[in-house]
């Protein structure tokens, strides 16, 4: 008799958002300006998030979608009630650093910001929802960028430590699952968002990125140390933008190219989960003339304070080639990939690969042997509501169901340890990559368009009831 495939009874089902993509209220109650506020929609967006073009304030002629976003700051009770109706066990959200320390380098926090998140966490618990909190999700106070150069500056360790100490102390008993940095490997692809970096002409960009990465890695270790000291119940995770790099062919040079691309991603988690810099990275820095300044104390912190679990986003797999003539690209999560002829793609060119999620789960488990948490997964699509705001999003249901099956197989047939799953953008929000509203992920439709027009009214999509059933049956409803 075949054993029925199931999820653990303790499995944490839920959804995920980020402060800068949903809260809005960019200047409410003492909040300071952050890098994510000044990234406009349109053709300059990519140059700004990659640090090639400087924009440190709002400028005429641009639309900044994060200023209002979906106004969750004023509507969180309504939104969390909807999450509760779906039966969420967990809700992943992030803290806007500049709500807590408006400039980032103050000695005392902003009480209004602390109170907002306290109220939000209490609202979650009212519905039996466990908060999963990202300390920084592409979020850096602009003052820290203008005054100190963002994460290139070692002083950021002090400011981040103060933020963490404040959060862990204030929310002790309210939050026990923490992520230190969202998609930490994005520093290599979107350095202004990932680390508040802007580059000067002629500067060695890779040198700056890896120095900033070192500071973030040490900051993550400091956060892990503090979290465990302040509350031994705390669980701290790292967070990676994941997705396996398949070789374009079985030619050894393509296999090698895929391995090299994977190493660029896993480099960060190698440090956070294993506690030391991998030899391949040291050798690469040597070859490329990159000198990362670090102290013995840094190395000790990294070694002694590794993460409790590994979390990641998964949207698509990627393809790599060692042949420079192979160059048919397709879009992905900020960074592009070679096209995979065996896969279908979303409207934005992201390749749909549920088996790739199972492969990624196994790769991460084999590499680290630490519990995992899938904290982003979903399908960005154009949704067309009827006159009542209802969207029959069967395409989203199909995408998510296929990925739920892949998780279930990885748990039951491969033996990976997976704590939970939060779909990305459980309510429609502003896209981090493009700044669009029309690229929707949610179970809940929000009446707002790319120009900021709309009532912000919330309405349930077909996928709302589907996911409610998935959670109620602990995944058994997905056949």
Task: Give residue spans per PLM region.
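Catalytic domains of carbohydrate-active enzymes, especially glycoside hydrolases
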Residues: 71, 75-96, 304-310
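Short, flexible active-site loop motifs that bind/organize anionic cofactors or intermediates
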Residues: 66, 73, 104-107, 347
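Active-site mouth loops of central-metabolism enzymes
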Residues: 61-75, 152-154
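Active-site region of glycoside hydrolase catalytic domains
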Residues: 2-60, 85, 103-105, 114-479
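Glycine-rich, proline-tolerant flexible connector loops at the mouths of alpha/beta enzymes
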Residues: 95-109
């Amino acid at each position: 008799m075949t054993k029925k495939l199931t999820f653990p009874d303790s499995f944490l089902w839920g959804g995920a958002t980020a402060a800068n993509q949903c809260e809005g209220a960019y200047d409410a109650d003492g909040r300071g300006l952050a890098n994510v506020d000044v990234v406009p929609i349109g053709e300059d967006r990519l140059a700004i998030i990659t640090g090639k073009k400087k924009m440190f304030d709002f400028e005429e002629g641009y639309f900044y979608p994060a200023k209002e976003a979906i106004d969750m700051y004023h509507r969180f009770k309504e939104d969390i009630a909807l999450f509760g109706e779906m039966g969420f066990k967990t809700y992943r959200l992030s803290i806007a650093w500049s709500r807590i320390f408006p400039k980032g380098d103050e000695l005392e926090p902003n009480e209004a910001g602390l109170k907002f998140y306290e109220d939000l966490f209490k609202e979650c618990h009212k519905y039996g929802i466990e908060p999963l909190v990202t300390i920084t999700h592409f979020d850096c106070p602009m003052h820290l960028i203008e005054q100190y150069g963002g994460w290139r500056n070692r002083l950021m360790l002090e400011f981040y430590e103060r933020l963490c100490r404040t959060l862990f102390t204030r929310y002790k008993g309210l939050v026990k699952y923490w992520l230190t940095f969202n998609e930490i490997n994005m520093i290599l692809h979107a350095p202004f968002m990932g680390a508040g970096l802007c580059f000067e002409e002629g500067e060695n960009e890779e040198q700056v990125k890896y120095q900033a990465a070192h500071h973030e890695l040490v900051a993550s270790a400091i956060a892990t140390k503090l979290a465990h000291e302040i509350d031994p119940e705390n669980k701290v995770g790292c967070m990676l933008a994941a997705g396996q790099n398949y070789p374009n062919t079985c030619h050894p040079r393509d296999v090698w190219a895929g391995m090299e691309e994977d190493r660029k991603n896993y480099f960060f988690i190698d440090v956070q989960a294993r506690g030391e810099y991998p030899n391949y990275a040291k050798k690469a820095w040597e070859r490329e003339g990159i000198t990362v300044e670090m102290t013995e104390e840094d190395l000790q912190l990294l070694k002694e304070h590794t993460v409790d679990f590994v979390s990641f986003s998964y949207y698509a797999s990627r393809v790599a080639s060692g042949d420079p003539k192979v160059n048919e690209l397709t879009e992905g999560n900020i960074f592009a990939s070679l096209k995979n002829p065996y896969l279908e793609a979303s409207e934005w060119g992201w390749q749909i690969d549920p088996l790739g999620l199972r492969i990624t789960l196994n790769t991460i488990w084999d590499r680290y042997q630490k519990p995992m948490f899938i904290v982003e997964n979903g399908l960005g699509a154009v949704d067309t509501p009827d006159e009542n705001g209802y969207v029959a999003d069967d395409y989203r249901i199909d995408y998510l169901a296929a990925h739920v099956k892949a998780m279930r197989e990885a748990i039951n047939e491969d033996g990976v340890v997976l704590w939970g799953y939060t779909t990305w953008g459980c309510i429609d929000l502003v896209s981090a990559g493009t700044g669009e509203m029309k690229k929707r992920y949610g179970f809940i439709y929000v009446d707002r368009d790319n120009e900021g027009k709309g009532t912000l009214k919330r309405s349930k999509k077909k996928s709302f009831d589907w996911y409610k059933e998935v959670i109620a049956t602990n995944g058994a409803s997905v056949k």
